[in-house]
């Protein structure tokens, strides 16, 4: 598996961990994380920001990478993340022309239910992730969110018609 997880102090690739021994090695690891334009230059490329428990990080990433490769043999799924908090950034490139966003969403978001994950780690839910919110929140949690929204914003002035 070509799995690259980059955290603030660790890089995991092909299931091996590398701990930087100097400031220059630490910067080199962060360069991988910050200079991802080469990945997004393959179009289409779909970016995701998910989280799940750290204990499920490897299993979830392996599943999504495998599912992407089965769906698109010419495709790739690159995974970067924060090892210490379970946050992953996935870059899915089907390797063929066309609009495969909804198929890619399904491959990334559906397994989150099994791995007790969230469709968003750092960047909020937003309109695009709204259809998938049920994969990471129970009906009870969604009802509580709606209730809080109604209590705090009874006139729906804050982001009207958006997520909740």
Regions found by a protein language model. Give the residues of each.
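Single conserved hydrophobic/aromatic residue that forms the stacking wall/gate
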Residues: 1-7, 11
């Amino acid at each position: 598996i070509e799995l690259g997880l980059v955290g603030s102090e660790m890089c995991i690739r092909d299931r091996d961990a590398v701990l930087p021994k100097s400031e220059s090695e630490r910067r080199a690891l962060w360069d991988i994380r910050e200079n991802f334009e080469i990945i997004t230059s393959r179009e289409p490329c779909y970016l995701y920001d998910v989280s799940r428990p750290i204990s499920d990080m490897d299993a979830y990433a392996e599943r999504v990478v495998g599912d992407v490769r089965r769906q698109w043999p010419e495709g790739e799924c690159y995974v970067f993340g924060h090892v210490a908090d379970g946050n992953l950034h996935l870059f899915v490139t089907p390797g063929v022309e066309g609009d495969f966003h909804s198929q890619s969403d399904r491959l990334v978001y559906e397994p989150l239910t099994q791995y007790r994950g969230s469709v968003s780690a750092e960047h909020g839910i937003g309109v695009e992730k709204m259809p998938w919110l049920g994969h990471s929140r129970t009906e009870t949690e969604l009802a509580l969110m709606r209730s809080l929204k109604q209590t705090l914003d009874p006139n729906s002035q804050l982001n009207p018609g958006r997520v909740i």
